[in-house]
Amino acid sequence: MKRLFLVIVLAILTMAAIAQEPYKAYCEIVGTGNITGTKVKIEVDFGQKAKWATPNARFLVDENGEKMNFNSMIDAVNYLAKLGWELILAYPVTPTQGMSKDPVYHYILCKKVTSDEQIKEGINLKDK
């Protein structure tokens, strides 16, 4: 009986040691509007490795591979909140050069995960 109890306790301790502690993963979403100002395109940066031709340019796409347009940045945040992301910080950056003086919105989000595979769960990305 003592041996069985010892085996069970060791099995439980082993499983507890294997279980990973959740950690926070972060991403940045950058929103840019179109000419009509009616929709926002969202670029996502998970800190992924940059590609030579399109460094860190990743847009949210639907199941058909089409770029997703959102009504506003909050619409995009709500979409990501359904996937477990939480808004941490938001700030605008206004261009100082060029024709457009419209601000580009940057939002920082975080999500608790236990593996890197969970970071992009439910999110489809496509280069520009």
Where are these predicted regions, by residue range?
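Terminus-proximal functional modules
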Residues: 5-6, 18-128
